[in-house]
Amino acid sequence: MTDQQVRIVSLGDIAPNRRRGGDLRALLTPTTAGSTSGFMGVAIVQPGDRIAEHYHPYSEEFVYVTEGALEVDLDGVPHSLGTGQGLLIPQDMRHRFRNAGDVEARLVFHLGPLAPRPELGHVDTEDAEGNALPCDGAHAGHAAGHERPAPAAEVVS
């Protein structure tokens, strides 16, 4: 038997994070649910809205579209992702999401493994309006000699 407490978290329990665009809600995290290997959340993206380009130096990101459709740029290469489709975004791959449709899009995301500290897990490369941010090589995993690998991704219907 385990001593771990079961925690049910509702979308409405989590405040929206709009700093990167869209409405991002990290539902199941070390803080909210006691997770130790990753975290899961939901992104709600209105028509014409976007989630700014970023990458994760320690984690892969698994995404699954539950409603609507999104354009996702993977290291600058655009791909379409629709309802019922999933995508694995490799560690270190730059990515951004756009809702080019006319209905709300919802995306479930999971990242794992966790970064050594939360502030190291996410590197923004542009702001919510799409303006490039300076890239600090000492930021995130780069301080430990971490290098970005060559791009690779696959979208499967």
From Swiss-Prot:
Residues 116-157 are annotated as: Disordered. It comes from the Bacteria. Residues 42-108 form the Cupin type-2 domain. Disulfide bonds: none annotated. SUPFAM superfamilies: RmlC-like cupins. InterPro entries: Cupin_2, PKS_Associated_Protein, Polyketide_Synth_CurC_prd, RmlC-like_jellyroll, RmlC_Cupin_sf. Belongs to the SchB/CurC family. This is 16.7 kDa protein in whiE locus.
